Amino acid sequence: MSDKRRYFGTDGVRGKVGQYPITPDFVLKLGWAAGRVLAKQGTRKVIIGKDTRISGYMLESALEAGLAAAGLKATFTGPMPTPAVAYLTQTFRAEAGIVISASHNPYYDNGIKFFSYEGAKLPDDIELAIEAELDKDIECVESAELGKASRMVDAAGRYIEFCKSTFPSKLSLSGLKLVVDCANGATYHIAPNVFRELGAEVIAMGVEPNGLNINDQVGATDVRALQKRVVEEHAHLGLAFDGDGDRIIMVDHLGNKVDGDQIAYIIARDALRRGELKGGVVGTLMTNLGMENGLKQLGIPFVRAAVGDRYVMEKLLEKGWKIGAENSGHVILLDKVTTGDAIVAGLQVLASVVGSEMTLHELAKGMTLYPQVLENVRFAGDNNPLEADAVKAAVSEVEAELGSKGRVLLRKSGTEPLIRVMVEGEDETLVKQSALKIAQAVKDNC
């Protein structure tokens, strides 16, 4: 079996709807191939959730047909955050969980990602086995062995109660005014209820999904509307989730953005204060130097993993630590959950706000963020602009100019045809100029 993936990226199979591989026929076959592999593992039962994209209906039906042909029973939750599917997969002792989502991407993209019976991303060998089955012709099991489908009517209530259970029982959100932005995505009927039931006054936005407006000028990837609303409403803070509920960005009462690095820092510092910190914190190559320095001042160990929440998870398991994060808002808290969970992460920050009697603004000031500029350059074809001499020369020039007071990172996105250019340093003007210089070199060689 080849160890090179053709379909699975860092977050499952993803692409533009209607273009291979996000087509009904391929997704049907993917369901069958996954069913063949998973049927050998155990219970022949899977939990399937989705976000609010209009294409979710089509892909859900295709998956159902493929899984049934392989003899698996599918239980559908309807719109449900990705971490909720991971949780329900565990509690129902299912063999796997499947989420139909393209996370923070626009509505015209979609994808399929899988969770193991432990609620974690599928191991590499299982993904490769599924890809091997995709090369075969579909063969249905005997008619008496065909799978059935059912609906889980209480999935939302189950997950809401789980989220609330991760918040300290002696604390309450009473007296807090929160603005909650659900990105017109999968958390729209979950997150506002979690915070309200814990006592907060909640102003909800991004809670009117129509199949096309997911992540559209709302949510964790665009917090401008949330920043404006928090200030207008004189709220204590705001929370923004992405389309599938595995990313969180927060906003303080002044309208300042608080990213995944700062969120992880606040959670780690609070755990240290309570004497409950287990090990250190895992970040990524994109993690701000300010977080690393801030943790160092507290005596908290820090290591970097490759970009992608699956690599953060791998490093956490390797080190035996419990807190990991990406600055984009993936926050993994292994003492609470098995995967990145935005609502649960937000609750831990709120516990710190209430428990310390400090504002989010005050808590976030504990670390100083270095100016960091990210430029995305779209490319097509098989060429690799990162190997171009002109790009390498531009990087070398910038690194020489930044010296020890900054860094440069270029990488291919694992989910989109993008080259990501990141420059970080003490001098914001120089950082911006440097990022544009490298991005232009990349564009010229695409």
Swiss-Prot record:
Q: What is its EC number?
A: 5.4.2.10
Q: Which GO terms describe its biological process?
A: carbohydrate metabolic process; peptidoglycan biosynthetic process; UDP-N-acetylglucosamine biosynthetic process
Primary enzyme class? isomerase
Could you tell me the keywords of this UniProt record?
Isomerase, Magnesium, Metal-binding, Phosphoprotein
Which residues carry out catalysis?
S103
Phosphoserine: modified positions: S103
The record's listing under CDD domains reads: GlmM
Q: Where does Mg(2+) bind?
A: S103, D242, D244, D246
Q: Which SUPFAM superfamilies match?
A: Phosphoglucomutase, C-terminal domain, Phosphoglucomutase, first 3 domains
Quote the Pfam families the UniProt record gives: PGM_PMM_I, PGM_PMM_II, PGM_PMM_III, PGM_PMM_IV
Example of a GO cellular component annotation carried by this entry: cytosol
Q: Which cofactor does it need?
A: Mg(2+)
- Tell me the first and last residues of the signal peptide: none
UniProt keyword Magnesium present: yes
Q: Which family does it belong to?
A: Belongs to the phosphohexose mutase family.
Q: What does this protein do?
A: Catalyzes the conversion of glucosamine-6-phosphate to glucosamine-1-phosphate.
Q: PANTHER family recorded for this chain?
A: PHOSPHOGLUCOMUTASE (ALPHA-D-GLUCOSE-1,6-BISPHOSPHATE-DEPENDENT) (PTHR42946:SF1), PHOSPHOHEXOSE MUTASE (PTHR42946)
Recorded protein name is Phosphoglucosamine mutase
Q: Which lineage?
A: Bacteria, Pseudomonadati, Pseudomonadota, Gammaproteobacteria, Vibrionales
